[in-house]
Amino acid sequence: VGNALGYAHAVGVMHRDIKPDNILIGPYGEVLLLDWGLAKVWHSDDPAASKQTEVPDLDVGVSMTNAGKLQGSVMYMSPEQVDREADIDFRSDIYSLGAVMYEALTGQTPFSGTLVRKILEDVRHKVPDVPSHFGSLAVPKVLSDLTMSCLSKDPDERPGSAEEVVRIIQHNWTS
């Protein structure tokens, strides 16, 4: 997933709806990132430019709404996505990747509840329990720290890119 995000970000595309339902693992272990209906594309002449083009909704579901409203799945939304900030960038996808990692490590989303308003407030202000301290699970500290870094409320405190997330994981498990 990190590699797919890294490629998308490198060509100026932000997914904006990273969640387990949009991740498919094929029969040979290949990982596919699905449902690009909320993706935002930056013009190719300047990937960091504020001038952006919306990709039309291809698969509108309950978690998605019209322009100017919340777009995405609340359990995996970044604080800046919840606040509908105009200058949202690829770091929002890094947050969502962290939420998916958190769920993979703990079996639970970072924030839960039955009231959407409460979940959104938690996304904005609450720090989830650290995965390595979650129940009796043995989660490697480096993976727990990386996940919590991705879930930082401040986008500047998250890993600098999806490639950095992949690099940290590869460095600690392939060497």
Please give the residue ranges for each predicted region.
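Short hydrophobic/aromatic patches on the structural cores and recognition surfaces of FHA
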Residues: 1, 16, 77
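Protein kinase catalytic-loop region centered on the HRD/HxD motif
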Residues: 2-13
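C-terminal lobe helix-coil module of Hanks-type protein kinase domains
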Residues: 5, 24, 34, 73-175
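Short coil/turn segments at alpha/beta junctions that flank glycine-rich nucleotide-binding fingerprints
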Residues: 10-12, 27, 112
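Catalytic-loop of the protein kinase fold
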Residues: 13-21, 25
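Short, flexible, glycine/charge-rich loop motifs used to bind or transfer phosphoryl groups or to couple energy/partner
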Residues: 22, 65-67, 136
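Activation segment of protein kinases
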Residues: 28-30, 34, 39-79, 114
